[in-house]
Amino acid sequence: MAKKVVGMIKLQLPAGKASPAPPVGPALGQHGVNIMGFCKEFNAKTANQAGLIIPVVITVYQDRSFSFILKTPPAAVLLKKAAGIESGSGVPNKTKVAKVTKDQIREIAETKMPDLNAGSIETAMSMIAGTARSMGITVEE
């Protein structure tokens, strides 16, 4: 028989740096999950992605066990890393803060493809380019 799901928790955590401190502790604690067990497992699986924010979906079962699925980092985080900037523009339509190439957009789109509801790499690239524009990043040919 399948385990009964009692909760789904969605968090965005820095890769390899999950700790029982907020926001992890309170979110997992209210469902009775072993917080240290989750932190150790998450940190082990994300150790090679240091510096990125990793979204994670944790499924909590009735017997207090859990499983989790790692998603790809948000497009904005990948774009900031590719452009080498700390944050996007406050006024993206007026102030442009950086430039990225089509090749960088393609690379990010290929990374994000499993989590995007895009049929082809071209549509995924246009989604990523839209995110870049809304952050004040210019896309060059």
From Swiss-Prot:
Gene Ontology molecular function terms on file: large ribosomal subunit rRNA binding; structural constituent of ribosome
Modification comment: One or more lysine residues are methylated.
Keyword field contains Disulfide bond: no
GO cellular component: cytosolic large ribosomal subunit
Known function: Forms part of the ribosomal stalk which helps the ribosome interact with GTP-bound translation factors.
Subunit (UniProt): Part of the ribosomal stalk of the 50S ribosomal subunit. Interacts with L10 and the large rRNA to form the base of the stalk. L10 forms an elongated spine to which L12 dimers bind in a sequential fashion forming a multimeric L10(L12)X complex.
Family statement drawn from the similarity comment of this UniProt entry: Belongs to the universal ribosomal protein uL11 family.
Protein name: Large ribosomal subunit protein uL11
Organism placement in taxonomy: Bacteria, Bacillati, Bacillota, Clostridia, Eubacteriales
